[in-house]
Amino acid sequence: MKVVSSLKSLKKRDKDCQIVKRRGKIFVINKKNKRFKAKQG
């Protein structure tokens, strides 16, 4: 999982990426290709 300050560019890496908010943190997840994961912070 990558940790970045801005998730906008990482959301565009794949068309199935989606942004979710869990426990007060923002994540990019991808259910079809699990390697596209990122966390903001």
UniProtKB/Swiss-Prot annotation:
GO terms for molecular function: structural constituent of ribosome. InterPro entries: Ribosomal_bL36 (IPR000473), Ribosomal_bL36_sp (IPR035977), Ribosomal_L36_bact (IPR047621). Keywords: Ribonucleoprotein, Ribosomal protein. It comes from the Bacteria. One of its GO terms (cellular component) is ribonucleoprotein complex. GO terms for biological process: translation. Disulfide bonds: none annotated. Belongs to the bacterial ribosomal protein bL36 family. NCBIfam families: PRK00831.1. This is Large ribosomal subunit protein bL36. It comes from Rickettsia akari (strain Hartford). The lineage of its organism: Bacteria, Pseudomonadati, Pseudomonadota, Alphaproteobacteria, Rickettsiales.
